[in-house]
UniProtKB/Swiss-Prot annotation:
This is Chaperone protein TorD. GO terms for biological process: protein complex oligomerization; protein folding. One of its GO terms (cellular component) is cytoplasm. Keywords: Chaperone, Cytoplasm. It comes from Aeromonas hydrophila subsp. hydrophila (strain ATCC 7966 / DSM 30187 / BCRC 13018 / CCUG 14551 / JCM 1027 / KCTC 2358 / NCIMB 9240 / NCTC 8049). Belongs to the TorD/DmsD family. TorD subfamily. It is found in: Cytoplasm. The keyword Zinc does not apply. Involved in the biogenesis of TorA. Acts on TorA before the insertion of the molybdenum cofactor and, as a result, probably favors a conformation of the apoenzyme that is competent for acquiring the cofactor. Its main location: cytoplasm. Pfam families: Nitrate_red_del. The keyword Cytoplasm applies. Transmembrane segments: none annotated.
Amino acid sequence: MQEFLATSERRAELYWWFATLFTAQLSDEQIAEYDSYDVRSFLKSLSTLDPMRPAVAELNDAIARLLVRPERANALAGDFHELFLANDAVSPHESAHQDAAALERMKARLSRLNIDVSAKYQQPVDHLGVELDLMGNLIIRAAEAASADLRERWLGEQEALLHGHLLAWFPHFERACRAADPFGFYGASARLLGVFLTMDANYLSLVKPAPAAD
């Protein structure tokens, strides 16, 4: 159980980190944190996982260039705007890559779970950041569940969000983001997130309790 709790905390932190990256522009102070011991150690720990190693290396290269980029905060803000906010942007909304009903499905999911994100997010609820943030919250709910049945329920909610939403549209977003990002910070981040989502789906398939025998 302790291993499950530790893994849950780490998974939630990863989802929330990615949610922050793709929801708002980074300040110069936030960019500076990428040169800190904590972030370097965090990325180094991810690189110990074989599937993540090439993606982490690409992101580390982008970070190294970003740290010495002239007017780095303004330059990265420009990248963010051109990539995600401009008229011909790579939309970070599921409905732009799937169908318009994706937004209504996310609204229904949040309503069923009794979760209100309006105080935290101004974006429509099918935004990548909202979906990633929700995954983090579902992970913590499973970790804090008072019974095995509740834990299984929250693990099932994670699988449903991952397979029914994120994995269904994120690969399209990832490809478009990488193709449209000449500097490469957000493209590298999208690549790492794509690897993580696939790995997390595999993890959930292993950690969910097996069906009871007849």
